[in-house]
Amino acid sequence: MSELQEEQAQVSNTKNSQKLIIYLIVGALITTAGIFGYTELYQKPLEAKAADAMYVAEKYFANDSSELVLNGDGTSKGVLYIIKEFSGTNAANLAKYYAGMSYYRLKDYNKAIDYLKDFSTNAKQVQAVAYGSIGDAYSELKKNEEAIEYYKKAGTHFPEDEAISSEYLFRAASFLELNGKNDAAIEIYKQIKQNYPKSEKGFSIDKYINRLQVQP
């Protein structure tokens, strides 16, 4: 290959590389614009509509009106509608929590578990309560192993909250006792004694530890 041909080949390769870079940049810009457009033109208005729909449902939830929370009152929609129609919004995610808790109050424990498992939040206290409520639902279904698993998750998810953590750890230990796992129960009782001595459960935890330790 002559020097001229080599130079032409290099120029061609450079141009191809530049084209590729341009295509990548344009593609990135289109993607960014698409995300921005989706957020501004679709997602934000959807979030606003979902939040408006949640307002009445939250009021019913505060009043323990579980059927109205789930299905609405004929004028306002319930959380089941919000979950379906506003999927992907923050309000729909929160609606899953309200749905799970409402089904629990109505003693429909399997549906409570399904909705609460599908809920997630960065608010650690709320997430801990959701885990604990799943544990409660499993306990009502006499599924003790599953209840213990979720009580432990609830009790360790946000250790800074003494009340929530000590309460759910205590429930985990209690169900370990029911399952005949006394050594494991003692370990959790001791964990409560060490980490949460000033909590409601911590004040009386010694009697549970002593009772198990004196058993033959």
Predicted regions located by residue number:
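Short solvent-exposed coil/turn linkers within tandem alpha-helical repeat scaffolds
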Residues: K44, I83-A92, S120-A128, T156-I164, ...
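N-terminal positive-inside, membrane-proximal cytosolic segments immediately preceding the first
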Residues: M1-L29, A33, G37
